[in-house]
Swiss-Prot record:
GO CC list: extracellular region
Domain comment in the entry: The C-terminal domain contains a V-shape binding site for sialyl Lewis X.
UniProt protein name: Enterotoxin-like toxin X
Family, as annotated: Belongs to the staphylococcal/streptococcal toxin family.
Species annotation: Staphylococcus aureus
Length: 203
């Protein structure tokens, strides 16, 4: 349903090139060093490359893990077969509730306010199911596409003032998955998310 996740390699490549230019005598920046200096420089090269590469690769892997999990259009027997997990203006059935997702995406200083909602049956669901459906709706607008983790939270607000916070940069915690929520008690879902300028935003 969604565009296949593909990663970019420019950050790691630029890091390696910049390190080579700064520390290697072969580029003509510094005079040729003796063997002990070259060995020291080589060790320094490897240490700095490790600092650059590990966080980047780790972040990309986590983004892909989140995308792979939340882009699935089924969860515990529930599915998006009727396209109820994306924006709709269809009249509701008696047993349905429409939950509006209200908030902002910020990309490179520009603020977007996408229009979206989800349509659910009036029933008790788990926080794991609700978390999945809400993030699925956000993925249709670009969440977890690219190489960088988003920043910010998604908040489920109930009519009695309760709140359930979903942290966009990581999966829902295991100990919260079985919390039960009646969909008819949900007021709305709010969010303030910040995307990297280097990722393509689909809003």
């Amino acid at each position: 349903m969604f565009k296949k996740y593909d990663s970019k390699n420019s950050i790691v490549l630029k890091s390696i090139l910049s390190l080579g230019i700064i520390y290697s005598g072969s580029f003509g920046i510094y005079p040729k060093a003796d063997a002990s200096t070259q060995n020291s420089s080589s060790v320094q090269d490897k240490q700095l490359q490790k600092v650059e590469e590990v966080p980047n690769n780790s972040e990309k892997a986590l983004v892909k893990k989140l995308y792979d999990r939340y882009s699935k259009d089924t969860i515990n027997g529930k599915s998006n077969k009727s396209r109820n997990w994306v924006y709709s203006e269809r009249p509701l059935n008696e047993n349905q509730v429409r939950i509006h997702l209200e908030g902002t995406y910020t990309v490179a200083g520009r603020v977007y306010t996408p229009k979206r909602n989800i349509t659910l049956n009036k029933e008790v669901v788990t926080l794991k199911e609700l978390d999945h459906i809400i993030r699925f709706a956000h993925i249709s607008y670009g969440l977890y596409m690219g190489e960088h983790l988003p920043k910010g939270n998604i908040v489920i607000n109930t009519k009695n003032g309760g709140k359930y916070t979903l942290e966009s940069h990581k999966e829902l915690q295991k100990n919260r998955e079985n919390v039960e929520i009646n969909t008819d008690d949900i007021k709305n879902v709010t969010f303030e998310l910040v995307k990297s300028v280097n990722d393509i935003e689909q809003v």
